Amino acid sequence: MMMPELVVALDYPESEQAVAMAARLQGSCPWVKVGLELYTAAGPDILRRLKDMGFSVFLDLKFFDIPNTVRGAVRSSVCAGADMVNIHLLGGARMAQAAVQGLQEGCECKGLAAPPVLLGVTVLTSMAQQDLPAGLDLPLDSVVDVLARSGREWGLNGVVCSGYEVESIKKSCGTDYICLTPGIRPAAADDDQRRTMTPQQAARAGSDYLVVGRPVTGAADPAGAAYSIMESVRQA
C-alpha cells in the first residue's frame, strides 16, 4: 500500500486564524487546503504566507465557469503560488482544456519546471444518490466514473472523489491518476459529509491524498492529531 499524503483543511473566515493554526501544524503535515471561505476573505496573500511557512497549498475553489474565465482563474491561481487547483468536471471538455492551458500559462508566469496538480471534482462528498438532479438516472458511482474518465481524456492529473470510488477510478483511469479524498473522519461522525471514510479505509482503497479538517484543527493538539492519523494509516 502506498502511503497517502495528509492535507489539512484550513476552513477559517479570516487569515490570522488560518495562519495561527498553520503555525501549530508545522512539521506534522506537508499540505494545507485553502477553500472558498478563507480565500474570499484573505485573497492570494494567504497562499504566500502559508508557502513561506513551508506548506504546499491546495487551492480548493472548484472553478466552474465559461472556458476563458476558468483559464484565467487557473493561471492566476498558479501565479499566486497554488501547488494544486481544481475545477468542476461538469463544466465539460472545453472548460477543462482551457484550465489545462491556464495551468501551462501559470507555469510560464512563475518559471516552474514542474506544473502544479490539476484535479477535477466529480460528485461532492456531501452528496448521496438522492441529491443528484432529477432526470439523472445513473447510479452515483457511475456518474463519478464517467466524469473521472472524461477528466483523464481532457488532460487532468486526477480527481477529487470519495474513498468509495477510488478503486474503480484507479482501474478505469490508471494507477497514476491521482485520487484526492475529502470527507476523511477518524471516527464514525460524518458532520455535513455523506460519503465519508476513515483514513485507514481510504488508504487501503488507494487514495493519494487525504483531506482532513475538523478532526485535526478542532483537536486540543492539532499536530498530534495529524501525526496520529498518519500513524493509523501506516499500521493499516
Swiss-Prot record:
Pathway: Pyrimidine metabolism; UMP biosynthesis via de novo pathway; UMP from orotate: step 2/2. Its EC number is 4.1.1.23. GO terms for biological process: 'de novo' pyrimidine nucleobase biosynthetic process; 'de novo' UMP biosynthetic process. One of its GO terms (molecular function) is orotidine-5'-phosphate decarboxylase activity. CDD domains: OMP_decarboxylase_like. Substrate binds at residues 11, 33, 60-69, 125, 185, 193, 213-214. It holds the Pfam family OMPdecase. GO terms for cellular component: cytosol. Transmembrane segments: none annotated. Keywords: Decarboxylase, Lyase, Pyrimidine biosynthesis. It comes from the Bacteria. The active site is at 62 (proton donor). It catalyses: orotidine 5'-phosphate + H(+) = UMP + CO2. Belongs to the OMP decarboxylase family. Type 1 subfamily. Catalyzes the decarboxylation of orotidine 5'-monophosphate (OMP) to uridine 5'-monophosphate (UMP). Homodimer. This is Orotidine 5'-phosphate decarboxylase. It comes from Oleidesulfovibrio alaskensis (strain ATCC BAA-1058 / DSM 17464 / G20). The gene is pyrF.
